[in-house]
Amino acid sequence: NNYTDGDPDSYPKAEKLLDYEAGYPFANHWLTAGANFYYMDYTDQLVLTGALNDIGEALTENVPDSYRMGIELMLGIKPCKWFQWDINATWSKNRIKNFVENIPIYDGWNLLDVVSVSHKSTRIAFSPDFLLNNRFAFTYQGFEAALQSQFVGKQYMTNAEVEALTLDKYFVSNLNLAYTFKPRKVVKEVTLGVTVYNLFNEEYENNGWASSSYDKDVNHRIDSAGYAAQAGTNVMGHVSFRF
């Protein structure tokens, strides 16, 4: 929208990123582990600020200074040939410094004006502070069972860090069962399987939209949001052939 429907006199600048990382991996016959520290220093990062074009479409704008920093940890354990455990986690801090929020003022459906609200430091939208992935895998001859789980922390849906415009943290698990065998003719390998998604029927949303506005007297802030609710427990079967 910035190029097709935005102001031709105020095209955004290219964003710049300096990424600093330091890590250490370890591996032997039954254990893998690693840690990685990172600091991502943005200049002129393009983000949504609430700015709109002439027809009300959202525009991205450059913010002078923002960053992402954190630590990534991973661990893999295989104590025997039929079991493996893999887990990884990320703790992060994702911030925009001196963020300026643009809030439109409406009279009904008519856009009257836009006011700017300055914030000292805000969380970057859709950037949870904590992520966790876990997987238990069991194999025996041609059988395989794997339980994969993911935890995602609370997320803000705008860069203004408005508590009313958030996605709640959630924890969801999927179970995969499969059997692989080798026919004697034509097909080298066949895998039959079934996957149970959202095994524990968690009610959660993993995406959405959000916006803020004022009514015409500028005394009533309106925070609006929509959420992408995800499916409850559902099952999918699959079959694959290798020739």
Stretches found by the model and what they are:
Residues 39-41, 61-159, 242:
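Gram-negative outer-membrane beta-barrel transporters
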Residues 151-156, 179-243:
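C-terminal beta-signal and adjacent terminal beta-strands/loops
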Residues 16-20, 27-29, 65-69, 128-132, ...:
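Residues that define the transmembrane beta-barrel architecture of outer-membrane proteins
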Residues 11, 21-25, 36, 62, ...:
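Outer-membrane beta-barrel architecture
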Residues 1, 30-32, 41-47, 93-99, ...:
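Gram-negative outer-membrane beta-barrel proteins
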Residues 11-62, 67-69, 95:
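Membrane-embedded beta-barrel scaffold of Gram-negative outer-membrane proteins
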Residues 1-8, 47-59, 97-120, 209-225:
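Solvent-exposed loop segments that connect transmembrane elements
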Residues 30-33, 82-85, 142-146, 184-190:
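Repeated loop/turn-to-beta-strand initiation elements of outer-membrane beta-barrel proteins
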